[in-house]
């Protein structure tokens, strides 16, 4: 979750030769406001005002250091929390699965805060590349999910979870992985934006197509959920960033910390709530998730090669196809398939796994790019 994990701003020369900024916000934002906690409120207020004294500046510097540390070791932190939730679920039982939608909505607002009009430039300057990538996104992963449910003969409660992961848009953490892989960052950002915009229409339709025989799928209800939890917060964040950019520039510096904390919370909530069942079928779920993710990488890259795209574009499409907004998959499973508690598990496991595999693949791609030179 997807990306579905941290925000990174990277400046560099993209394939069109211009200096651009890649902004990335995978995952969700943790807020315990509903539980009366004041941490989030405190820091939101501080971030909306530039520090005007040495004490506040020092606090911000400390927060930035924590943010950098959490971003760097995000995969390790998520794995550790997943293990804790699995083997000692009572320690994180205070994090409820009912928080998932709120967390995802807040992170999408954060994603909107990082978006600028030029992030959509690639959609108009290179529409062919974006179309190829998005078609691959919404054909490869849903079809792979469907095939895996058949091959492994998954029960309906797990099958719908796997299919939801496949039908969701690309995860936003794919942007930073593309940057690390020396891929086409502009294309990655454009694909993420377009696939997210298309999600309210295609995710319910594809879920109905591939899972409709197993479970009841209410497409209209899913459409409204995605609009409410994803599209509206992104638009609001985009508008706020446009009119209050001086304030949001300071806020985005620590969004990775909030985002990563949220992913950890979502994983902890889902895993702890289903720890007993995971212990009995965990290896099966993990095998399906790994195959889904790795085959997505491979087929995404192959599609780019077959269509004679250059290596930077192939790397971007590979990572974009393989990494999903698994946070959205978890949210939809919890909201629309509550009668199947295990449906949330594939999304949670995918959130852990794809951040690990994405980093490994990005490193391999980067080495390959270096050897080519």
Language model: regions and residue ranges:
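Family-specific functional microsites
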Residues: 30
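Alpha-helical transmembrane segments of multi-pass small-molecule/ion transporters
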Residues: 13, 37, 46-47, 51-373
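N-terminal chloroplast transit peptides
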Residues: 5-6
């Amino acid at each position: 979750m997807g990306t579905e994990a941290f925000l990174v701003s990277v400046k560099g020369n993209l394939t069109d030769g211009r200096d651009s900024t890649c902004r990335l916000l995978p995952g969700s934002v943790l807020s315990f406001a509903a539980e009366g906690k004041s941490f989030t409120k405190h820091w939101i207020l501080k971030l909306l005002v530039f520090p005007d004294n040495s004490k506040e500046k020092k606090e911000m510097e400390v927060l930035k250091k924590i943010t950098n540390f959490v971003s760097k070791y995000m995969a390790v932190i998520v794995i550790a929390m997943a293990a804790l939730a699995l083997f000692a679920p009572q320690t994180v039982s205070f994090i409820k699965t009912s928080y998932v939608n709120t967390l995802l909505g807040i992170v999408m607002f954060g994603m909107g805060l990082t978006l600028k009009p030029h992030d959509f430039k690639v959609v108009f300057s290179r529409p062919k590349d974006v179309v190829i990538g998005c078609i691959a996104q919404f054909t490869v992963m849903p079809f792979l999910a469907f095939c895996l449910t058949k091959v492994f003969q998954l029960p309906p409660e797990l099958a719908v979870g796997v299919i939801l992961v496949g039908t969701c848009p690309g995860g936003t953490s794919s942007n930073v992985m593309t940057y690390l892989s020396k891929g086409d960052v502009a294309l990655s950002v454009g694909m993420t934006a377009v696939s997210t915009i298309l999600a309210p229409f295609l995710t319910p339709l594809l879920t109905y197509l591939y899972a409709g025989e197993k479970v009841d799928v209410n497409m209209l209800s899913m459409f409204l959920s995605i609009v409410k939890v994803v599209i509206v917060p992104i638009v609001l964040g985009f508008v706020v960033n446009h009119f209050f950019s001086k304030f949001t520039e300071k806020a985005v510096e620590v969004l990775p910390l909030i985002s990563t904390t949220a992913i950890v919370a979502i994983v902890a909530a889902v895993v702890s709530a289903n720890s007993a069942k995971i212990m009995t079928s965990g290896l099966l779920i993990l095998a399906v998730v790994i195959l889904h993710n790795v085959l997505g990488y491979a087929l995404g890259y192959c599609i780019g090669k077959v269509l004679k795209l250059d290596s930077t574009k192939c790397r971007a499409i590979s990572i974009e196809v393989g990494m999903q907004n698994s946070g959205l998959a978890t949210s939809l499973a919890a909201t629309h398939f509550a009668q199947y508690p295990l449906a949330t598990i594939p999304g949670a496991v995918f959130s852990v796994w794809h951040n690990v595999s994405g980093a490994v693949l990005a490193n391999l791609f980067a080495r390959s790019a270096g050897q080519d030179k």
